């Protein structure tokens, strides 16, 4: 796996070659944005904005010293505000794809045992208190009217080998991570390994990702009962009086200590509300899943399993 410092250095070295004038003009054309020829064209503004991001703690006033052009910080801010968000999104996606290809073509250092490793996780960001953002994203519970700030929920897909953010989905604050993952599945390719937390441990997502011939590594959901006893019976194999606390996964075989293969069955009554019942019924009726338990021991930290 490539280090973070090496990945950042590769991004800075390759960004200029990938982000040429034609790429930015194509992004403006695809999104329908028309502009006049002036000092701060979208080509100049977007390049300066990326330089501002890559250089830590660079204020807008310092951007004026990164080029030979003569303009003020206020003019740069206004020019950046004129560019639609769709143009930035199109340029970012083009840059990410180009940087991923440039790093993967040179060596296999960005892969984990030959697999492309992706990470998915959600977070929240606070935004300015304006009516449009309040209506779109909302505020946390318990905040008095007029006192809080709107908060957006972000679901991020990260390429672990380079640290590049492949895509971001912004949604209202009270949105669960699992509801938005389907919008990121187009980035998952066969033989990829997707790493997520327990929010993505569900039959629906395991099935959708396995249909794309990808591998999934997630933490077991807190409501999922796991039992590593060899030859134990599943929930459906026990009498009704003995089903309390029994695992629903059918035991197949043991692969070692705290390591086993189990079979999950699709149950129509557990269809998620975001998936149509017809699509749910088209998923495989049974999944073979590997369950294992390990402990992370770090000196000075609590042991987790």
PLM features per residue range, with description:
Residues 1-57, 62-63, 70, 76-83, ...:
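Single, function-defining residue in the core of a domain
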């Amino acid at each position: 796996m490539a280090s973070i410092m090496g990945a950042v250095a590769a991004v800075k070295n390759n960004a200029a070659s990938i982000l040429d004038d034609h790429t930015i003009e194509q992004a403006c054309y695809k999104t329908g944005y028309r502009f006049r020829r002036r000092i701060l064209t979208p080509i100049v503004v977007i390049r300066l904005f990326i330089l501002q991001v890559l250089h830590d703690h660079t204020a807008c006033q310092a951007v004026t010293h990164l080029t030979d052009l003569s303009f003020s910080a206020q003019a740069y801010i206004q020019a950046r505000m004129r560019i639609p968000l769709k143009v930035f999104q199109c340029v970012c996606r083009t840059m990410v794809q180009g940087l991923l290809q440039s790093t993967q073509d040179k060596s296999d250092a960005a892969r984990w045992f030959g697999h492309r490793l992706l990470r998915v996780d959600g977070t929240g960001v606070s935004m300015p208190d304006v009516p449009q953002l309040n209506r779109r994203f909302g505020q946390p519970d318990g905040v008095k009217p007029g006192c809080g700030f709107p908060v957006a929920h972000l679901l991020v897909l990260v390429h672990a080998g380079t640290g590049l953010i492949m895509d971001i989905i912004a949604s209202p604050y009270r949105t669960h991570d699992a509801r938005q993952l389907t919008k990121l599945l187009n980035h998952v390719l066969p033989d990829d390994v997707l790493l997520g937390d327990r929010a993505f441990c569900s039959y629906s997502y395991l099935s959708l990702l396995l249909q794309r011939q990808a591998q999934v590594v997630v933490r077991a959901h807190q409501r999922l009962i796991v039992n590593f006893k060899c030859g134990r019976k599943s929930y459906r194999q026990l009498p009704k009086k003995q089903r309390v606390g029994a695992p629903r996964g059918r035991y197949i075989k043991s692969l070692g200590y705290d390591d086993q293969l189990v079979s999950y069955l699709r149950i129509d009554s557990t269809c998620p509300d975001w998936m149509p019942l017809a699509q749910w019924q088209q998923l495989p009726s049974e999944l073979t899943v590997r369950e294992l338990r390990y402990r992370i021991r770090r000196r000075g930290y609590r042991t987790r399993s």
